[in-house]
């Protein structure tokens, strides 16, 4: 299976002056923990890392540390643009691709394998977890105007897996129609293309804020203790 790792983000919401994937958590970089899970999966045979040129040296050194090989792909100004560029960097024979946020360092290796299996069966798939909080829609002036049915709500995660050619077609349509999406499942949704949910662990968080870093540190440290 081909895997694209999104690593072109910044550390703005983290309050850091560097890419959050380079920050230390439980003694290692965020990205190193993610790569450790990739390495322990059974399905990943090719890795592309989509990042900013300014981070290339640091990120490549983490791959060396983890004894993994990857193709470097320069990312864009948004996640959407970075995925487009990542698709251009895939090998010509790539039929399926998993896309994973490099900041989801708590991902379990088996999740890559389960997504890969569904994808090989012809099913577009995303990892997700049921929402446990009650979700409110709020007006601009702060008043509640709708409560959603929690039973129908899932929090989207990664990996997300798609047929390569179909995903390329989707991104072309997005460019033509000037659509902006925050993940590729949203793009498929706009086009009416089915995507299946694969339930994953609530621990598969995206490390985005200082609080996330504390949670990740505690969970990764506890895994080591076990």
From Swiss-Prot:
Pathway: Isoprenoid biosynthesis; isopentenyl diphosphate biosynthesis via DXP pathway; isopentenyl diphosphate from 1-deoxy-D-xylulose 5-phosphate: step 2/6. Catalyzes the formation of 4-diphosphocytidyl-2-C-methyl-D-erythritol from CTP and 2-C-methyl-D-erythritol 4-phosphate (MEP). Gene3D superfamilies: Spore Coat Polysaccharide Biosynthesis Protein SpsA, Chain A. CDD domains: CDP-ME_synthetase (cd02516). It comes from Prochlorococcus marinus (strain SARG / CCMP1375 / SS120). One of its GO terms (molecular function) is 2-C-methyl-D-erythritol 4-phosphate cytidylyltransferase activity. This is 2-C-methyl-D-erythritol 4-phosphate cytidylyltransferase. The record marks 13, 20 as: Transition state stabilizer. Keywords: Isoprene biosynthesis, Nucleotidyltransferase, Transferase. It catalyses: 2-C-methyl-D-erythritol 4-phosphate + CTP + H(+) = 4-CDP-2-C-methyl-D-erythritol + diphosphate. Belongs to the IspD/TarI cytidylyltransferase family. IspD subfamily.
